[in-house]
Amino acid sequence: MLIDIGVNLSNQQFKNRVADVLTRALSAGVEKIILTGTSISESRAAVALCDEYQSQFPNMLYATVGIHPHEANSWDTASYRSLKELASHSAVVAIGETGLDFNRNLSTPKEQEVAFEAQLELSTELQMPLFLHERDAAKRQLDILTHHRESISNAVIHCFTGDKKTLFSYLDLDLYIGITGWVCDERRGLELQKIIKNIPLNRLMVETDAPYLLPRNITPLPKNRRNEPAFLEYIVRCISEHREESEEVISKMTTATALKFFALD
């Protein structure tokens, strides 16, 4: 059994393909999937998918609800209430995707911090874990998280791609680490491959971030280059190789960690 903690199933690339994608995921041993909310509308779409496919795929889909740093300029006084209402749905297991992204600054750093801090407050009020994004903003994000750490119930750094120093800084805050197909990339993933063994197994979770970040150790690569949850096993395989631990151990431990972190059935 595997759990994919981050899938963008409401993405247009999956339109009219959701049932097939979920069927292939089950065939590949992926029994639970957490859909990522990145805006109010995408969070609603994620929750709607959980409802739509509950009868056909019982207790397989869950969701996060939040506003991604790219969308932070959409934050207003109604956003908090909207996310709180969405978070009351039984399938919602975390607040996010939230955090800071100073790589592209599609929203200004100030706008990002306002939305981030508000979602930290929401997670504290609801005592729900955080699903965090961070790109080229580790120092500021760590400062904010350190300030709020005592009130945060739990948090996972989704799609970690940072260096060893940043990894240890997050681990020092007792945060969890999500690993995607980035680790399978023979060009961009070399640093992550070297430090993956430094993540305690009980702090590690796996995710595809589908349809993005297709694992490059798939042979042959699918012609459409579209990632999906069924390919989670390739990420586990790569982690296994670089940690020098069996795929069975990686699968068992990451699943146990995700079940506990998200309080899944």
Functional labels for PLM-detected ranges:
Residues 1-265:
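Mid-domain alpha/beta scaffold segments of enzyme catalytic cores
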